[in-house]
Amino acid sequence: MIEKYKNILITFIALAAIVFLVGCSNKKTDQVTDKKINVVVTNSILADITKNIADDKINLHSIVPVGKDPHEYEPLPVDVQKTSKADLIFYNGLNLETGGNAWFTKLVNNANKKENIDYFPVSTGVEVIYLEGKNTEGKEDPHAWLNLENGIIYAKNIEQQLSKKDPVNKDFYKHNLDKYVKKLSDLDQQAKSKFSLIPENEKMIVTSEGCFKYFSKAYNIPSAYIWEINTEEEGTPDQIKNLVRKLRATELKSLFVESSVDNRPMKTVSKDTGIPIYSTIFTDSVAKKGENGDSYYSMMKWNLDQIYKGLAK
């Protein structure tokens, strides 16, 4: 009988030990998972650049949904929650998220986050282009990522802050950055070579919003537009009339319309000038997953290819 109770006791102790060890193992696993830093970015373009560098080493949340306008946005409760718990926050800067309704400023202030401690502009180091005739702070053209050289600056700034916040993975981040920079740089050089072949009198990119100034400077292609920035009036009769008048004096073969804006004003321009809309292109957002342009690299490649084909046809 005593021997029987002994065996039961030994079995009980063994089971208790197994439960304890499994519990410790799960706790360690949870601790490893919890070591991932929480990163919040303001839009899908920054999310993709960050993902290329950090991969699965971080918990990543992007605020403005794919296809939506980051100029003026109303954060959802989940955005507020993720921002308050974020270890690191990346935003474009250049008045993109802080102009208009200043949604980002309100978001980080309410979360008690501090600039250059908790949140960082990825555009630091970019040569700023301003809205026409407005060379003052708060009047920056924010669309710097449409020049691949600036996309590389964004990536380097993101890697720098990731490595500071998470030094355990800094070699991983740097390795991924180097690969990504080469990929973007190769595409940039290919584009410059192709656009140099187009006759000067056929070079002009016409879009709805005047968001291609950085692109124009990078690839030596003049730009024209209906309205200058999405936070102002969009597609008024006078704006359309002024662009139509300008285009009638050109030999332009193609117009373009952005994926994130109403295409009706550009359709009116096309009808009044006889110049066809060649393609939709990407500006403020990548495409939906699985579609052409669903990453920063692929949206830029799409833009470069479509604009080249439209101008060279």
Curated annotation (Swiss-Prot):
Lipidation, S-diacylglycerol cysteine type: 24
Lipid sites, type N-palmitoyl cysteine: 24
Species name: Lactococcus lactis subsp. lactis (strain IL1403) (Streptococcus lactis)
Compartment(s) of residence: Cell membrane
Family: Belongs to the bacterial solute-binding protein 9 family. Lipoprotein receptor antigen (Lrai) subfamily.
The protein's name in its UniProt record: Metal ABC transporter substrate-binding lipoprotein
Primary subcellular site in the record, as a coarse category: membrane
Function in brief: Part of an ATP-driven transport system for a metal; probably for manganese.
InterPro entries noted in UniProt: AdhesinB, Bact_metal-bind_prot9, Lipoprotein_PsaA-like, ZnuA-like
NCBIfam families: ABC_lipo_SloC (NF040928)
Name of the gene: mtsA
GO cellular component, one term: plasma membrane
Residues involved in Zn(2+) binding: 71, 143, 209, 284
UniProt entry keywords in alphabetical sequence: Cell membrane, Lipoprotein, Manganese, Membrane, Metal-binding, Palmitate, Signal, Transport, Zinc
